[in-house]
């Protein structure tokens, strides 16, 4: 039997900045889409979400952070915060793929409508390229059906057309 842990997670790889606390049954989160403000907002967001969840930092058993793809500066903000928190209490850190988190967020917010179809996640990588990954939920776990890759936007459009995903999520202008 898998024992669920109290987890504090941060996502700073995209234009949005988010923090969540999850105990396996309930999730509390804060989300900010204010550009270029991750470093200014994240610590107060951690405090706010812990307060809302009625959880003290001493109750956190594990930390999670997105490791990319994504904004280099944004990723460093998330890494720095999680590294500091992990060091303070010698907590384990779970690395998460940003594109898989985007797919999981879609599933969480559309669970009643979601089938078992492919979800393709995209992030703008600039210079006419995007990071792309394709994921399928089997009822228990995500499988990585299209390996995370960097593609020209036109190539990504063709791949999406050919694969006919249930949903495309992410951030490409």
Regions found by a protein language model. Name each.
Residues 2-3, 37, 92-173:
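Surface "functional belts" at beta-alpha junctions
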Residues 2-67:
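N-terminal beta-alpha supersecondary unit
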Residues 16, 71, 129:
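Glycine-rich nucleotide phosphate-binding loop and flanking beta-alpha elements
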Residues 25-26, 71, 140-141:
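Residue-level signal for well-ordered, solvent-exposed loop/turn and beta-edge residues enriched
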């Amino acid at each position: 039997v898998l024992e669920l842990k109290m987890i504090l997670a941060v996502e700073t790889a995209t234009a949005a900045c988010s923090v969540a606390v999850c105990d396996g049954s309930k999730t509390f989160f804060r989300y900010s889409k204010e550009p270029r403000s991750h470093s200014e907002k994240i610590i107060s967001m951690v405090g706010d979400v812990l307060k809302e969840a009625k959880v003290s930092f001493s109750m956190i058993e594990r930390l999670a952070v997105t490791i990319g793809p994504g904004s280099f500066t944004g990723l460093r903000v998330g890494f720095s915060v999680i590294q500091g928190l992990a060091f303070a209490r010698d907590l384990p850190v779970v690395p998460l793929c940003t594109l898989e988190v985007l797919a999981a967020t879609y599933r969480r917010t559309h669970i009643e409508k979601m089938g078992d179809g492919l979800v393709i996640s995209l992030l703008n990588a600039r210079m006419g390229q995007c990071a792309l990954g394709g994921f399928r939920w089997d009822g228990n776990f995500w499988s990585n059906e299209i390996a995370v890759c960097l593609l020209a936007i036109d190539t990504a459009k063709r791949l999406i057309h050919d694969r006919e995903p249930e949903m495309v999520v992410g951030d490409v202008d």
